[in-house]
């Protein structure tokens, strides 16, 4: 019996050992995934939007919605999310997941599944039997075969669009369908429509809004950007095949379940769309180029730098660009007659008198575009609607095709200078010689080359100017702005837009102690204290106590003006000019005013002209501080001339005239 008993014991033990070695298939898939280090694979990290810290610490996903992660630690643990994702695909579906009122992970994450299946070769017999009808219907409706990056030009009346905007267009494979019926992918802050521009800007900078992906018919965006906001669209067809396009589209479906904290400067529309392009081609490392801020026009330049990435470029002019193009091709007398008709000073029959059919067609087409543009700005009255219909009827009688689309009258964004700038200057002033260093995070000022930008505009964020006079031991802040915006939209026969200028930050002025009192507010103690920070100490002409002489101080500064502009920027001429008259207010604060801060009326003129790589400009502001009775008015006149040797460099000769102070300087700027 002993040999038999020993055999039975050995058999039982060996059987137990064999059965203990048999593993759940899910565990096997997980082990294979870890052995392949899929949690470290770039594509997995792209799908979950993981980013490594700049210095040290764990990887962290930029997705901020908890519902995007299947593991409780998924936001910071790629391995845990990988294991939980594999396990979830094999989970039995809940009743609501079968009905698809809620999505099973198998249907919720189609691109995660596709990629993991390509790496692990899942057994289809072990997977739940789900049709994923919602996803199938969605992807079939989009039918992705190509991808375009879209750049919508700058819109100065909206803080979200000061730098332009990026979106993607998913091309459909249906040749019979118009391209405008394709779908566009947008990433934007989900803000309240009741938020003011100031609230939007502050919360946008601080990441106070959730950013979400959304999909619209492309014609909807064309209507919004091209027609309602008169923004040109530049389309860049990317060299992605159908399989790559479908990968991107499948991942967009996955992102519908989450949000990203929206940051105005970095994690914005451009940045998040670049992450989608990396899904299409993981070898592209586009986001690595942007650490501090991401700007839509810089995104366009970046994709054009990637060899072979852009297949074709096309231009979709805005309603105002179409109108200006048609007006440009009219004769001078024809333009005058069109203007008179639009002002109600000429009847339609008189407009067309003595004109051949071709010229009549061109004039009527210009009027129709002008009418559409006017309708985008205001609601037409019944009388105006009737006049519009009369023009349509008259145009239908002329059997002559519209003017063939001409060369764009504006430059594409890639032709513009870099958004960042460093500037080195040397100058002479009332206080003697000085050296100056300036740096600007973004974007464009009045004297910069306008190629790729709104002509004669300024959009600046965080420009700072540090100056050291030769007699000083330490430098001081000459100027600083949180933001500075100058919008000079010209008055035309079609519309009368308001031009405006806003600036918030610090500037410098010259002061003489010609009044007897002084008062320092608590927040301005640094200006008076003996231990004041060297960056904001005044620049005296001689000794500190010599109040009879001119000295220069750094002030808190705020400007806001509005008015009207006259210009020929839409004429198509080589020599362009602008002239703007504005009225508004000026706030200036420092420790030498009795009130601490003065608020006074101001009048301003902005004018300039450009030709080729040359530009001349003058801004003149007059501040009526005399309303307080014991202060003198001040003024600031800033002439300048600029030459651009190349796209990303410029040389300037600038001056400044203020009360008690004058200066002139020569500078060299480099853009990046």
Regions found by a protein language model. Give the residues of each.
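Glycine-rich catalytic cores of cysteine/serine-nucleophile enzymes that process amide/ester linkages
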Residues: 143-230, 439, 448, 468-480, ...
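Outer-membrane beta-barrel initiation region
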Residues: 266, 270, 315-458
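Solvent-exposed loop/turn segments connecting transmembrane beta-strands
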Residues: 426-435, 467-477, 508-514, 550-557, ...
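Low-complexity, highly charged intrinsically disordered N-terminal segments
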Residues: 54-143
């Amino acid at each position: 019996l002993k040999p038999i008993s020993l055999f039975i014991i050995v058999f039982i033990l060996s059987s137990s050992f064999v059965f203990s070695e048999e593993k759940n298939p899910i565990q096997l898939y997980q082990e294979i995934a870890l052995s392949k280090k899929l949690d470290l694979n770039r594509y997995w990290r792209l799908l979950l939007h993981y980013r490594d810290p700049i210095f040290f610490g764990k990887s962290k996903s930029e997705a901020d919605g908890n519902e995007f992660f299947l593991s409780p630690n998924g936001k910071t643990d790629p391995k845990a999310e990988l294991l939980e994702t594999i396990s979830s695909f094999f989970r039995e579906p809940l009743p609501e997941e079968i009905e698809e009122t809620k999505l099973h992970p198998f249907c919720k994450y189609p691109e995660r599944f596709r990629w993991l299946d390509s790496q692990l070769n899942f057994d289809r017999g072990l997977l739940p039997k789900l049709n994923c009808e919602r996803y199938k219907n969605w992807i079939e409706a989009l039918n992705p075969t190509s991808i375009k990056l879209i750049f919508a030009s700058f819109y100065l009346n909206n803080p979200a669009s000061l730098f332009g905007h990026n979106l993607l267009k998913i091309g459909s494979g249906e040749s019979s369908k118009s391209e405008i019926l394709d779908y566009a992918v947008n990433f934007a802050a989900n803000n309240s429509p009741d938020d003011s521009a100031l609230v939007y800007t502050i919360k946008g900078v601080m990441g106070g809004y959730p950013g979400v992906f959304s999909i619209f018919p492309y014609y909807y965006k064309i209507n919004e950007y091209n027609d309602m906001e008169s923004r040109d669209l530049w389309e860049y067809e990317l060299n992605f095949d159908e399989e790559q396009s479908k990968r991107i589209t499948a991942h967009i479906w996955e992102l519908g379940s989450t949000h990203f904290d929206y940051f105005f400067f970095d994690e914005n529309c451009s940045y998040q769309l670049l992450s989608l392009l990396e899904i299409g081609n993981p070898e592209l490392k586009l986001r690595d180029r942007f650490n501090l801020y991401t700007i839509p026009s810089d995104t366009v330049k970046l994709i054009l730098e990637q060899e072979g990435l852009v297949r074709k470029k096309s231009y979709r002019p805005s309603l105002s660009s179409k109108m200006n193009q048609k007006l440009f091709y009219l004769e001078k007398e024809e333009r005058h007659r069109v203007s008179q008709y639009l002002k109600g000073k000429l009847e339609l029959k008189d407009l067309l008198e003595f004109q051949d059919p071709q010229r009549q067609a061109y004039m009527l087409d210009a009027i129709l575009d002008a009418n559409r543009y006017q309708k985008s700005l205001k609601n037409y009255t019944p009388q105006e609607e009737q006049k519009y219909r009369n023009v349509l009827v008259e145009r239908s009688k002329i059997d002559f095709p519209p003017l063939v689309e001409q060369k764009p009258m504006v430059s594409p964004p890639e032709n513009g200078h870099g958004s960042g700038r460093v500037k080195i200057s040397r100058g002479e002033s009332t206080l003697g010689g000085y050296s100056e260093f300036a740096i600007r995070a973004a974007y464009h000022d009045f004297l910069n080359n306008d190629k790729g930008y709104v002509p004669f505009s300024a959009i600046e964020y965080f420009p700072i100017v540090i100056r050291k006079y030769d007699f000083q031991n330490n430098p001081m802040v000459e100027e600083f702005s949180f933001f500075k915006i100058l919008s000079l939209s010209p008055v035309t026969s079609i519309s009368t837009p308001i031009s405006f200028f806003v600036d918030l930050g610090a500037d410098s002025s010259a002061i003489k102690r010609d009044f007897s009192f002084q008062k320092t507010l608590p927040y301005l103690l640094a200006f008076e204290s003996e231990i004041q920070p060297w960056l904001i100490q005044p620049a005296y002409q001689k000794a500190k106590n010599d109040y009879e002489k001119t000295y220069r101080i750094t002030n808190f500064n705020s400007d806001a003006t509005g008015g009207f502009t006259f210009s020929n920027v839409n004429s198509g001429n080589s020599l362009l000019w602008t002239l703007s008259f504005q009225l508004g207010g000026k706030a200036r604060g420092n420790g030498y005013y009795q009130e601490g801060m003065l608020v006074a009326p101001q009048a301003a003129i902005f004018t300039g002209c450009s030709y080729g790589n040359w530009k001349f400009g003058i801004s003149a502001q007059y501040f009526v501080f005399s309303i307080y009775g014991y202060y003198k008015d001040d003024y600031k006149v800033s002439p300048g001339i600029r030459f651009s040797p190349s796209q990303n460099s410029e040389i300037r000769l600038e001056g400044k005239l203020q009360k008690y102070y004058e200066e002139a300087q020569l500078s060299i700027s480099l853009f990046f």
